[in-house]
């Protein structure tokens, strides 16, 4: 039922169902992780962070929890060194994962390390040409004065997933449409 609600973007209802399930089984790291992801969708960022930290305590090898927490910090441009450490731990647990590599590239960009960000994001995009990775890679290219290549990457991302929120928001924010 939660999956159906997620697919139709009924985040609040999905969150409530997961919350009820987690009351019955409070130490289920996977359910807590799912609830954390729904908390983020309904802008309960503090709750998301608490839930992800609980997941990490319960299941220290849960790479996606480290990545989600680190990415959330990086995306909000807060506690960037902590974000980098969390994402680096996720990458240790699942080396080569393009989504985690994307997150590390994003935090490096937020830290002002554009060359390292570009290297990581190019690698992630080459492995998995995903629209969200395209959004991040394009933004780094844009910031480095490579607008034509950024537009090309974004166009590829739109072809793959025209409705991707991160890509759409990036283009609007940078006035790059």
Task: Mark where each language-model region is.
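Residue-level recognition of tetratricopeptide repeat
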Residues: 3, 28, 37, 62, 71-72, 97, 106, 130-131, ...
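Structural signature of tandem alpha-helical TPR/SEL1-like repeats
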Residues: 7-20, 42-54, 76-89, 111-123, ...
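Structural marker of alpha-solenoid helical repeat scaffolds
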Residues: 24, 58, 93, 126-127, ...
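TPR alpha-solenoid repeat register
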Residues: 31, 65, 100, 133-134, ...
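Bacterial c-di-GMP phosphodiesterase catalytic domain signature
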Residues: 70, 124
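Terminal, low-structured helical/coil segments at or just beyond the last alpha-helical repeat
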Residues: 78, 131, 136, 143, ...
């Amino acid at each position: 039922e939660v999956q159906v609600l997620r697919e139709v973007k009924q985040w609040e209802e999905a969150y409530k169902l997961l919350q009820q399930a987690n009351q019955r089984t409070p130490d289920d790291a996977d359910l807590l992780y799912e609830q954390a992801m729904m908390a983020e969708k309904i802008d309960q960022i503090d709750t998301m962070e608490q839930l992800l930290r609980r997941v990490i305590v319960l299941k220290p090898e849960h790479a996606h929890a480290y990545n989600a927490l680190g990415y959330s910090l990086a995306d909000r441009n807060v506690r960037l060194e902590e974000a980098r450490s969390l994402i680096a731990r996720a990458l240790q647990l699942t080396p080569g994962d393009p989504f985690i590599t994307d997150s590390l590239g994003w935090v490096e960009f937020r830290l002002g390390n554009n060359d390292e960000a570009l290297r990581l994001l190019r690698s992630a995009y080459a492995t998995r040409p995903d629209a969200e990775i395209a959004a991040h890679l394009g933004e780094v290219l844009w910031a480095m004065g490579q607008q034509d290549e950024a537009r090309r990457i974004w166009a590829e991302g739109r072809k793959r997933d025209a409705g991707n929120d991160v890509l759409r928001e990036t283009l609007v924010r940078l006035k790059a449409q």
